[in-house]
């Protein structure tokens, strides 16, 4: 299941209120820990008042790394590095162009989930924005040499959890940047060639990812190095496994550096 979100917003000159979205679960407000992690939105032409929401990270003052499945490249996107609401569209967001990997394909992914492949994109901002720091790209093959249960920091915007009771669980959404520690699940299968795997089931002080977190960085613990970008989860309750597209692959790095 994709981890981008379609949300309804109250928008006039500002973006302030949203409902029914999800992000880093079992986390805590990020504050200024990861100022280079931002939120990207795209207005949906045939759905007035609705936007698609994803997360991502600044690689430079005009390049924003995210997931290829997040947006339509035929329409403009907007990026903000503000950690939480209220958001003023005219001043907090910068317009940009969405550039998905040319080989991105839905339903073409390896392994049983088979969700997608080459799920990486770069937003080229129309004007430079310095959020106060930048994410760093990894060296080629870095993930392959990391041991099992390497610490990974996950960061993103969206729903922070669920309210459970009668009926369907209700999502808790604050439109705020959250972070949580997680652990790398190393495996040797067809998916590990392109994706890393993290638990999406919050426990023992660890966090997970969910809808709305797409494109957000999976950072090598305690660093600004992006190992992968969040791609999809295996169930609707975000309590299964999270798959993130590796950024340390030669062809992915060549694509990113070519934008």
Locate predicted features.
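Positively charged n-region of N-terminal signal peptides that target proteins for export
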Residues: 1-4
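Bacterial N-terminal signal peptides
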Residues: 8-16
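Bacterial Sec-dependent signal peptides at the C-terminal "C-region" and cleavage site
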Residues: 15-23
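C-terminal subregion of chymotrypsin/trypsin-like serine protease catalytic domains
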Residues: 22-24, 30-36, 40, 52-74, ...
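Conserved catalytic-core segment of clan PA serine endopeptidases
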Residues: 24-33, 76-144, 169, 188-190
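Short loop/turn motifs at secondary-structure junctions and domain boundaries
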Residues: 45-49, 201-202, 207-211
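Short, solvent-exposed aromatic-acidic interface loops
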Residues: 71, 100-104, 199-203, 230-235
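Chymotrypsin/trypsin-fold serine protease catalytic domain
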Residues: 117-206, 235, 240-242, 249-256
């Amino acid at each position: 299941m994709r981890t981008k979100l379609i949300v309804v917003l109250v928008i006039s000159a500002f973006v302030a209120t949203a409902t029914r979205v999800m992000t880093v679960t079992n986390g805590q407000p990020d504050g200024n820990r990861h100022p280079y992690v931002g939120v990207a939105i795209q207005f949906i032409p045939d759905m007035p008042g609705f936007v698609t929401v994803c997360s991502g990270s600044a690689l430079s003052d005009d390049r924003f790394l995210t997931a290829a499945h997040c947006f339509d490249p035929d329409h403009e996107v907007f990026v903000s590095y503000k950690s939480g609401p209220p958001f003023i569209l005219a001043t907090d967001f910068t317009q940009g162009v969405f550039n998905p990997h040319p080989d991105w394909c839905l339903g073409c992914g390896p392994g049983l989930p088979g969700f997608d492949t080459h799920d990486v994109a770069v937003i080229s901002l129309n004007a430079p924005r310095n959020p106060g720091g930048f994410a760093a790209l990894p060296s080629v093959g870095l993930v392959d040499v990391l041991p099992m249960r390497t610490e990974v920091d996950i960061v993103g915007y969206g729903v922070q959890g669920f309210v459970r009771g009668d009926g369907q669980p209700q999502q808790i959404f604050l439109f705020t940047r959250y972070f949580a520690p997680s652990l790398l699940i190393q495996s040797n299968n067809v998916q590990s060639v392109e994706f890393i795997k993290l638990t999406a089931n919050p426990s023992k002080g660890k966090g997970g990812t969910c809808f709305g977190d797409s494109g957000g960085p999976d950072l090598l613990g305690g660093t600004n190095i992006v190992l992968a970008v969040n791609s999809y989860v295996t169930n609707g309750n975000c309590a299964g496994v999270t798959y993130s597209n590796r950024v340390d692959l030669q062809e992915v790095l060549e694509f990113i550096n070519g934008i």
